[in-house]
C-alpha cells in the first residue's frame, strides 16, 4: 500500500532535519493518511478509501464524495477513485432520463 492519498494524490516529500548547529540530515515528511468509509449518494453504497486529512476537509467542503469526485480531474485521482467517478457520472446521467419517462 503506497503512502499516497487516493483523492488528492498527496504523497511523501523529502527534506532536511536541521539541527541548532545547522547540520542537515535527510528526512521524509509523511502525509497524514486515514482509512475512511464514505457514503455515496448516487451509488447508494459505502466506499472505503485511504485519504489525507486535508482531503477529508475538501470532501466535506464540496458537499460529499459524489460532488468532490465530479469536480476533481481524473489526472490526480487514483485508479480506484477514477473508476468511482465514472460510475457516479453514469448513474447521475441515467437519473434525469429515468425521471423524464
Curated annotation (Swiss-Prot):
Keywords of the record: Ribonucleoprotein, Ribosomal protein
Pfam families: Ribosomal_L28
Molecular function GO labels: structural constituent of ribosome
Gene Ontology cellular-component annotations: cytosolic large ribosomal subunit
Disulfide partners: none
InterPro entries: Ribosomal_bL28, Ribosomal_bL28/bL31-like_sf, Ribosomal_bL28_bact-type, Ribosomal_bL28_sf
Any Gene Ontology biological process: translation
Family label: Belongs to the bacterial ribosomal protein bL28 family.
Official protein name in the record: Large ribosomal subunit protein bL28
Protein source organism: Rhodopseudomonas palustris (strain HaA2)
Amino acid at each position: 500500500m503506497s503512502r499516497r492519498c487516493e483523492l488528492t494524490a498527496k504523497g511523501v516529500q523529502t527534506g532536511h532535519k536541521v539541527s541548532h548547529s545547522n547540520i542537515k540530515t535527510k528526512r521524509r515528511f509523511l502525509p497524514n493518511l486515514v482509512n475512511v468509509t464514505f457514503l455515496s449518494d448516487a451509488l447508494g453504497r459505502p466506499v472505503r478509501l485511504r485519504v489525507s486529512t486535508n482531503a477529508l476537509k475538501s470532501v466535506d467542503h464540496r458537499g460529499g464524495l459524489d460532488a468532490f469526485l465530479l469536480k476533481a480531474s481524473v489526472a490526480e485521482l487514483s485508479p480506484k477513485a477514477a473508476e468511482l467517478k465514472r460510475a457516479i457520472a453514469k448513474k447521475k446521467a441515467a437519473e434525469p432520463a429515468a425521471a423524464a419517462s
